[in-house]
């Protein structure tokens, strides 16, 4: 059973029953239809409202063209509906074009930012894994899905300061098989807090610095574990942090009882900086390590390691 890193902004204890390679795309890919192409735009942009929110005060044609040009480059999933600074818009463009691709022994996978239409699938994936790690009965799944969806909606409002990534996997087809190409499926997800404005209001203990990037809520679909997917979710998160965040100290949590994830994080370069006291047991929580890694400067051709077990890649927070 894989542990799940979860740091939702509500207590789930009440639900218990009583007891690397960066792959940049400049055009559409028929092989990986779920990847979006990244377009280059140069503009002094200041807000990202959808068309219905743009002022209709257009006494001149020049005013109208100026307004529509300010949001047109962003896909609907990245339009926040609030005024943004130029720096925030540049980060949104980076998120929109971010893609991480890796060939695995059993197939191929890629990671990018979650789109709005993928929220329900992501909620279902998180609810399954979190319910599994908490040993919750199936009757609690609908409540858990509702709470997780509300959490994801709230987290999307802080884009581009925090982001949810999703990973897709396509199984390798035997060259001698007559079957067509396998359909890509959502295989995992992970949340990345990039800076203080994206930090969770109620982070698990030990508390990580709010100004530093933080990786959490990582999970891999149960029937796709032990393929290296979780490892590359972690590597994709680190690569995105290297591109956007000025801070290179990355934090995450790992439960003390999760020996395999702990060993994996150690291998990935994370070190324990603080550990929960026994007092957290009084709150019916597992003791956790807070771990930190200092990222190296982003290189143009990073060497990506292959790891065979996803069970070693999940971490846990307030469970």
UniProtKB/Swiss-Prot annotation:
Keywords: Chloroplast, Plastid, Transferase, Transit peptide. InterPro entries: Acyl_CoA_acyltransferase, GCN5-like_dom. Its main location: plastid. Residues 109-297 form the N-acetyltransferase domain. Its EC number is 2.3.1.255, 2.3.1.48. One of its GO terms (molecular function) is N-acetyltransferase activity. GO terms for cellular component: chloroplast. Residues 1-55 form a transit peptide. It comes from the Eukaryota. GO terms for biological process: N-terminal protein amino acid acetylation; peptidyl-lysine acetylation. It is an enzyme of class 2 (transferase). It catalyses: an N-terminal L-alpha-aminoacyl-[protein] + acetyl-CoA = N-terminal N(alpha)-acetyl-L-alpha-aminoacyl-[protein] + CoA + H(+); L-lysyl-[protein] + acetyl-CoA = N(6)-acetyl-L-lysyl-[protein] + CoA + H(+); N-terminal L-alanyl-[protein] + acetyl-CoA = N-terminal N(alpha)-acetyl-L-alanyl-[protein] + CoA + H(+); N-terminal L-seryl-[protein] + acetyl-CoA = N-terminal N(alpha)-acetyl-L-seryl-[protein] + CoA + H(+). Pfam families: FR47. The active site is at 265 (proton donor). It is found in: Plastid, Chloroplast. Coiled coil: none annotated. Expressed in green tissues. Autoacetylated. Acetyl-CoA binds at residues 218-220, 226-231, 258-260, 265. Protein acetyltransferase with dual specificity triggering both N-alpha-acetylation (NTA), with a large spectrum of modified N-termini, including methionine, alanine, serine and to a lower extent threonine and valine as substrates, and epsilon-lysine acetylation (KA). Oligomer. Belongs to the acetyltransferase family. GNAT subfamily. This is GCN5-related N-acetyltransferase 5, chloroplastic.
């Amino acid at each position: 059973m894989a542990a799940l890193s979860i740091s939702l902004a509500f207590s789930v204890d009440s639900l218990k029953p009583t007891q690397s390679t960066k792959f940049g795309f400049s055009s559409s890919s028929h092989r990986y239809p779920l990847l979006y192409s990244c377009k280059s735009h140069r503009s002094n942009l200041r807000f990202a409202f959808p068309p219905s929110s743009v002022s209709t005060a257009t006494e001149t044609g020049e005013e109208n063209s100026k307004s529509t040009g300010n949001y047109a480059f962003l896909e609907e999933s990245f339009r926040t509906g609030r005024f943004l600074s130029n720096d925030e818009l540049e980060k949104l463009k980076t998120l929109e074009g971010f893609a991480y691709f890796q060939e695995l022994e059993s197939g191929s996978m890629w990671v990018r930012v979650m789109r709005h239409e993928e929220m329900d699938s992501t909620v279902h994936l998180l609810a399954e894994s979190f319910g599994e790690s908490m040993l919750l009965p199936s009757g609690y799944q609908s409540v858990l899905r509702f709470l997780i969806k509300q959490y994801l909606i709230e987290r999307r409002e802080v884009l581009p300061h925090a982001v949810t990534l999703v990973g897709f996997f396509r199984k390798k087809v035997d060259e001698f098989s007559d079957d067509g190409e396998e359909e890509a499926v959502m295989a995992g997800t992970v949340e990345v807090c990039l800076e203080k404005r994206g930090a969770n209001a109620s982070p698990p203990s030990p508390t990580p610095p709010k100004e530093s990037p933080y990786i959490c809520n990582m999970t891999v679909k149960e029937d796709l574990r032990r393929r290296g997917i979780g490892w590359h979710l972690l590597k994709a998160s680190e690569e995105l942090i290297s591109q956007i965040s000025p801070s290179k100290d990355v934090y995450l949590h790992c439960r003390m009882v999760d020996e395999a994830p702990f060993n994996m994080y150690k291998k990935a370069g994370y070190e324990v900086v603080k550990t929960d006291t026994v007092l957290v047991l009084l709150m019916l929580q597992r003791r956790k390590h807070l771990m930190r890694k200092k990222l190296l400067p982003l290189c143009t051709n990073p060497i990506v390691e292959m790891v065979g077990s996803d069970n070693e890649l999940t971490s846990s927070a307030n469970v």
